[in-house]
Amino acid sequence: MTDSPVLALTKDLISRQSVTPEDAGCQDVMIARLEALGFTIERMVFEDTTNFWARRGTQAPLFAFAGHTDVVPAGKLEHWHTPPFEPTEKEGYLYGRGAADMKGSLAAMIVATERFIAEHPDHQGSIGFLITSDEEGPFINGTVRVVETLMARDENIDMCIVGEPSSTEVVGDVVKNGRRGSITGDLTVKGTQGHVAYPHLADNPVHKSLLAIHALATTEWDKGNEYFPPTSFQIPNVQAGTGASNVIPGEFHVQFNLRFSTELCNERIVERVTQTLDQHDLNYDLKWTYNGDPFLTDTGALLDAVVDAVDSVNQTKPALLTTGGTSDGRFIARMGGQVVELGPVNATIHKVNECVKIDDLEKLTDMYQKTLENLLA
């Protein structure tokens, strides 16, 4: 039995061992298909990261698919039922690293676009593809660099579907219409190292910091809003001391992260954290890493088109949520356009035995094609 176009392409992409930031030829496969459709291709290589921007048409609106060809490492091979880079069908599922995150989405985007253009060769507006090999890594030379390049020449995406695995139980049951922002602080509180038997000759930075850390951890940053939960403050890492039980540490390192809603901004968070630390008279250094601002698409033609597309395939409308971590959508949203995420079920992403339901690949292709028809036919 011959594989369907989307299944065959998904298998081809999975078989390429594109562990971040490697692309392993995935983009060449996609580019060849897009060139055959009349897309203009612009490869953008920044250091170790491979990206491309493809566009068909010159008119507005500019609708784009966005995604990544890189995958996370497979982990321990002995825990996989099948080789992670040998796509394998079993009981209605396709197994392999990247099946759900997100080579299935990439294949669905390509096939949906091929079908749409075959039926509507003179479609309205323009179609774009923004593809990177640096989403699972440090996200320094990937989508953000492509976005900066496009914005510098005033080529802004009006509407974008990011193919992240948004679904929970069945494909299309959840569409992400926004994401929280993320900011990380690396705090070093300085004291004076000494012997625990002579505390008067030392200055314990852990003791001095606890009240300030407690104050930050119990702060009500905001109340959230209709679309976002309240901002959360979490401490993932702390470190102090030499490992010896008789040495007062000279420094105390605390790393914390805030996931914040549209009720807050980076600048306000920095201001409030600094105020709290200063109130406790600490000698400290604080370095910030800005991981992205929150974004929200609460209304608009894209959201209407996607909701209708999902409903036409599933006979039920998707839930619109902003839960989860960050995605490259945060960079694309800087252009001021509408951004949503729609992709496969995320139950096995980043796990051994990652898989996608084969029928879901067909449904996702139909959803993407229907979205194109709703917007550009």
Curated annotation (Swiss-Prot):
Its EC number is 3.5.1.18. Gene3D superfamilies: Zn peptidases. GO terms for molecular function: acetylornithine deacetylase activity; cobalt ion binding; succinyl-diaminopimelate desuccinylase activity; zinc ion binding. Disulfide bonds: none annotated. The keyword Cell division does not apply. Pfam families: M20_dimer, Peptidase_M20. Its cofactor is Zn(2+); Co(2+). Zn(2+) 1 binds at residues 68, 101, 164. Binds 2 Zn(2+) or Co(2+) ions per subunit. It is an enzyme of class 3 (hydrolase). The keyword Amino-acid biosynthesis applies. Keywords: Amino-acid biosynthesis, Cobalt, Diaminopimelate biosynthesis, Hydrolase, Lysine biosynthesis, Metal-binding, Zinc. GO terms for biological process: diaminopimelate biosynthetic process; L-arginine biosynthetic process; lysine biosynthetic process via diaminopimelate. Zn(2+) 2 binds at residues 101, 136, 350. HAMAP family: DapE (MF_01690). Homodimer. This is Succinyl-diaminopimelate desuccinylase. It comes from Vibrio vulnificus (strain CMCP6).
